[in-house]
Regions:
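Membrane-interface extramembranous regions
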Residues: 1-145
Length: 145
């Protein structure tokens, strides 16, 4: 198999896996929210709704990035750049949520398995996107020669 295709297939797989991880996180937040409501705790409703929305949206974005990459036949730079920007933005948001806090949610103290898994997957997305961009640049140079 061509190394270029191996990189993009791996990237698509990681993008889809990251999307699935975010759906699991959203489901976990939803079950936590339902549990709080069952105990009569309504103070965290807005926080949970924002978190669930963020995680579902993030999962959908990762699925969309994988489809965009496939649709452009892996030769456009923009999906790779978008994947890096989205992943980096979510990593920065995560770090901020654990240190200085983010609006509505505040400072989160819990670091779960899915948190770590999603950050590892996002780091791999960034690395594979860089590799994909490098391969595109090499292909362009080869065509010019």
């Amino acid at each position: 198999m061509n190394k270029n295709l191996l990189i993009v297939y791996a990237l698509c797989g990681i993008l889809i896996s990251t999307g699935i991880a975010y759906f699991f996180v959203a489901y976990g937040e939803y079950t936590d929210w339902m549990e709080l409501l069952n105990f009569g705790i309504h103070d965290e409703t807005t926080e949970k709704q924002v978190e669930i929305t963020l995680f579902v949206t993030s999962g959908l974005i990762y699925f969309g990035l994988a489809l965009w990459l496939i649709k452009t036949r892996f030769m456009k730079k923009s999906p790779y750049i978008a994947a890096m920007i989205v992943s980096l933005a979510l990593i920065i948001t995560y770090i901020a949520s654990r240190t200085v806090g983010v609006p509505i949610v505040g400072v989160e103290l819990y670091v779960g398995k899915l948190d770590v898994i999603s950050k590892i997957l996002q780091s791999v997305v960034i690395a594979l996107s860089f590799a994909g961009l490098y391969k595109i640049q090499q292909s362009v140079r080869a065509l010019r020669v």
